[in-house]
Amino acid sequence: MTNIFSLEGKTAIVIGGTSGIGRTLSLGLADAGADVIASSRRQAQVDETAAEIERHSRQTLRLCSDVCNRASLEALLAAAVQRFAKIDILINCAGIIKRTTTLTMPEEEWDDVLDTNLTGTLRSCQIFGKHMLERGYGRIVNIASLNSFVALKDVAAYAASKSGVVSLARSLAVEWAKRGVTVNAIAPGVFRTALNADLLDNTPRGQELLMRTPVGRFGKTEEIVGAAVYLCSDAASFVTGHTLVVDGGFLASGVNQ
C-alpha cells in the first residue's frame, strides 16, 4: 500500500528552520523522507541543523536567509533549484515577538514585528510560490499562533501579524487553488522552547496559560510534526486555506482547574 504521508522525493525549505519549532519541523520533514534546507539568519545554527539533517540520511544545503531581505530569499531559491532542481514544500516559521503595552509601543517595534512575521511570510510565499506555480505543484505551510484567534496581553503587534498570516494563507489558497499549490497554516498552542522557558516556568503567566490548556501541560515541539507532514503530503491534496490548530484544547476551553 502506498504511504500517502511519505515525503520521499520531495525537497523542502523551512524558513526559520534552525531553532525551536522550526528546527523540529526541519528534522521531522527529513524523517518523513524529504531533503530539507533549514535556513535562518545565523550561520552556526544553519550548520548545526544541516548536520543533523544529514545524520537523518537526507540531503541539504547550508544557506542563511533573512525574510526581511527579498534578495536573500531570491538567492536561497536560486541555490536550492540549482542543487535540487525543484522546491516542493515551503514552511514559513521565521518570527519574532516583542512584549510591551500597546500604548507605549514604539512604532518602530510594530514595524519590526509586522515586517518579519507577516510581510516576511508574504515575501517568501511570493518568491517560492512563483517557482511552485510555474511547476504546477507545491505545498506551503505558514506558522500562525493562538494569537491569530485570541488576545493575550502586551503582544498586540505579534497578534496582528499572526492574524494576518492566517488571512494571507486563505487568500493565497483561493488564488492558487487551481494551479496545483496548496497553502495552509498551523496554529501552535503553548509549546515550551528555549525562548519562552523563562516565561512559562514558575510564573503567574505560565500558570494561567497552563490552566487554560485542558490537557494539563504545555506542548512538546515534536507534537507539531505530524500536522506539518500531513499538510505537506499527498494525504492533504484536497486541503487548502485551512488553519490546523495544535493546542491541547486551548481554543476550545474556558477556564479549567
Enumerate the language-model features and the residues they cover.
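Alpha-helical segment proximal to the catalytic Tyr-Lys
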Residues: 130, 174-178, 237
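Active-site helix of classical SDR
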Residues: 125, 161, 169
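Active-site loop immediately N-terminal to the catalytic Tyr-X3-Lys motif
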Residues: 103, 150-156, 178-179, 216, ...
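Residue(s) in the substrate-gating loop at a strand-loop-helix junction
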Residues: 145
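Short C-terminal tail/terminal secondary-structure segment
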Residues: 2-3, 150, 229, 240-257
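Substrate-binding pocket helix/loop in short-chain dehydrogenase/reductase
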Residues: 101-102, 106-114, 140, 209
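Conserved glycine-rich cofactor-binding loop
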Residues: 11, 18-19
